[in-house]
Structures are given as C-alpha cells and as structure tokens.
Amino acid sequence: QEDIEAGKQKSATCTACHGQEGNST
C-alpha cells in the first residue's frame, strides 16, 4: 500500500493538467 499512497501523491500533480482520468485537457 505504500506504492498506492506514493502514486496518489504523484497523481495529484498530474491531475492538475490531465484530470483524474489521466486524459490530457
């Protein structure tokens, strides 16, 4: 689960541009 938590923190910066689904805006 450590990887999951790390992934959530990394995805937070990604979602700013790509959105929660991972799609580019």
Swiss-Prot record:
Name the SUPFAM superfamilies on file. Answer: Cytochrome c
**Ligand binding (heme):** C14, C17
Q: Which GO terms describe its molecular function?
A: electron transfer activity; heme binding; metal ion binding
| Transmembrane intervals | none
InterPro entries linked:
Cyt_c-like_dom_sf (IPR036909)
Q: Where is this region: Disordered?
A: 1-25
Its cellular-component GO annotations read: periplasmic space
Q: Which UniProt keywords apply?
A: Electron transport, Heme, Iron, Metal-binding, Periplasm, Transport
- Record note on modification: Binds 2 heme groups per subunit.
Q: Which Gene3D superfamilies match?
A: Cytochrome c-like domain
Where does the UniProt annotation locate this protein?
Periplasm
Q: Function, please?
A: Diheme, high potential cytochrome c believed to be an intermediate electron donor to terminal oxidation systems.
Under which name does UniProt file this protein? Putative cytochrome c4
